[in-house]
């Protein structure tokens, strides 16, 4: 015989547990501090911090990939925004808003691709289907660069100009903290990785001290070669 009261109690307990789980989602905060060479001091903006399960724990299911595609726009021989953070599976648009051709490519771990030449007013797309850091360039214009960070977690934040970071909707539990900064060496960033316990009473990551470097490396074109130097300007017209 169906136990009506018993099932009501089970359902009530389930709703209570769901309510507790939702209530235990918190906003995790932190602050980035930058140590840079004296001549190259930078604002602590655009550092990326994200949380993943510790080793041996089940992975986070990425389910809320946006229906609208984020864009990395090409305009005035630059990418906008310079930094884009997406979850695995996201389709990113690369519209060309310049009155000339571009050739967007990446040869790095997050996604290797070459969109080829495409003209003004057209758009090409890339689905980023694996986690990693993608450095994006144009094969025609060496001054163009951008970064797409692809994460297998929805729990991430980007520091503002004051270095403040908020990561919203994080369930209570244990996580590994990861940090990325464009001007920092990978080995320095690896030292910031640590495991933390997040709970309603413990939501702060504290201060994340990032050491930046003034080393900049010139990148190659998509063939692994140096870019061709632009031709010198021709002689000006002198009216007779």
In which residue ranges do the predicted regions lie?
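N-terminal secretory signal peptides that target proteins for export/translocation
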Residues: 1-7
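A general, composition-driven signal for non-globular sequence regions
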Residues: 3, 18-19, 30
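Bacterial N-terminal signal peptides
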Residues: 7-21
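Extracytoplasmic copper-binding redox domains, predominantly the cupredoxin/blue-copper superfamily
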Residues: 24-240
């Amino acid at each position: 015989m169906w136990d009506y009261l018993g099932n009501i109690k089970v359902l009530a307990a389930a709703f209570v547990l769901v309510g507790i789980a939702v209530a235990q989602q918190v906003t995790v905060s932190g602050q980035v501090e930058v140590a840079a060479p004296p001549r190259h001091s930078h604002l602590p903006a655009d550092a990326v911090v994200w949380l993943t399960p510790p080793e041996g724990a089940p992975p986070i299911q990425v389910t809320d990939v946006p229906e609208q595609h984020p864009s990395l726009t090409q305009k005035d021989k630059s990418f906008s925004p310079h930094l884009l953070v997406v979850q695995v599976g996201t389709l990113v648009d690369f519209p060309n808003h310049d009155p000339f051709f571009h050739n967007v490519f990446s040869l790095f771990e997050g996604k290797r691709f070459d969109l080829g030449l495409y003209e003004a007013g057209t758009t090409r797309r890339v689905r980023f289907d694996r986690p990693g850091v993608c450095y994006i360039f144009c094969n025609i214009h060496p001054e163009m660069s951008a970064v797409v960070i692809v994460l297998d977690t929805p729990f991430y934040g980007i520091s503002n100009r004051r270095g403040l970071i908020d990561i919203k909707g994080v369930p209570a539990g244990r996580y590994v903290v990861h940090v990325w900064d464009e001007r920092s060496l990978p080995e320095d960033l690896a030292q910031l990785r640590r495991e933390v316990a997040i709970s309603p009473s413990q939501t702060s990551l504290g201060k994340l001290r990032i050491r930046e470097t003034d080393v900049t490396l010139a990148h190659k074109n998509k063939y692994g070669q140096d870019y061709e130097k632009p031709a010198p300007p021709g002689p000006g017209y002198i009216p007779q």
